[in-house]
Amino acid sequence: MEFHENRAKAPFIGLVQLWQAVRRWRRQMQTRRVLQQMSDERLKDIGLRREDVE
């Protein structure tokens, strides 16, 4: 494989990693919002306490 054949892919790795980090952060925020809206009884059912989600 020649140098120029592999060169174009490298800059996109950083963009892919950034996009994955943004997606992960958005999922975590969405999960936190859902958990914060749950009642204490529901949180207890899934093994969490109010302090765990705040």
UniProtKB/Swiss-Prot annotation:
Q: Name one Pfam family in it.
A: DUF1127
Gene encoding the protein: yjiS
* Domain of life (superkingdom): Bacteria
This chain belongs to which protein, by name?
Answer: Uncharacterized protein YjiS
